Amino acid sequence: MFVRSALFLSAALMLGGCDVKTELGKPCTLVRKATAEEQETQGRKFVEIHEKDIAADQDFISFGSLDCEDLVCVRDDQSPRSENPEAFAQGYCSKECVQGTTTGCTITRTVDDVEEGLKDRMTCRPLLLDQDTLDAIKVADEGFYRRTFGENNSPYFCAGATPTSQGT
């Protein structure tokens, strides 16, 4: 009898305590695939992107960021920038999402490292080319597609809504 009660109590506690935390919104460094020369000299497949490499007021998505559980780091046009052009460009961890859904992009991090205001702006929106264009590129040259976009098959990612993406 005691064993059954203990198992039941353990199961109830485990189910009640399953508050899933993700890395969505966690600060990350934007990266790009290293050139063959960079891979040879640095011994890494990815290199950090500098502030000077990203135009102001643009969304940027980076695949391969080891800072993020889904390897996706995003910076939207409302994200803060460093004044130092040589500084590594920073963004926040993201993930693929399903167009039209209202769940899945909620930031659940409890640590105080999420960009101010990002929790209120986070939404599911396209950051890549439209779906038809992505599909056409994949059909035309799947190798190029994989080198450019990896295993991602959707243009939709969790990202901070901007006035442009909100239609204002």
Predicted regions and their residues:
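Bacterial N-terminal signal peptides that target proteins for export
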Residues: 1-7
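Extracellular glycan-targeting catalytic surfaces
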Residues: 12
